[in-house]
Amino acid sequence: MLHFEDFPAGKRFDFKPVEVKAEDVIAFAAEFDPQPMHLSHDGGKASILGGLAASGWHTSAMMMRMLCDSYIRETASEGSPGVDSMEWKRAVLAGDMLSGSCTVVEARVSRSRPGIGIVRLRAVVTNQRGETVAICDYANMIRCQTTGAVA
């Protein structure tokens, strides 16, 4: 189990590659973002995106899964106080392979909850061509292993 002390600035967690499947793009869009470019190949080709494209929210959800698989599920996480920024830099198309990493930007002990550390991270998702498709700046609240901890 990882604790706050395991998150010094500069620590990096790599994401395992994830294939963007057409059926998943369409299913997500049908439920949460029913726009033509997300619902069919023809709708995607007719758009400026050039093909069946994942919703930005779907891209964010895939990023969240990559975060969980790379470190969160093995961390004494107490959730997140929020996302500072979420940028969708390039269309994510059906058939793309996504990977990337997240890096600790800053870590400090909470002033109001001394047993909790606030860890700020930046996640960057890239496609199979190495192009950045999404960037997210966010924070995690992570339990400290010891009182008076330093990351």
Where do the PLM segments sit?
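HotDog/MaoC-like acyl-thioester-processing domains
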Residues: 2-9, 88-151
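Conserved interaction-surface patches within small, structured recognition/assembly domains
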Residues: 84-86
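Hot-dog-fold acyl-thioester-processing enzymes
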Residues: 1-82, 147-151
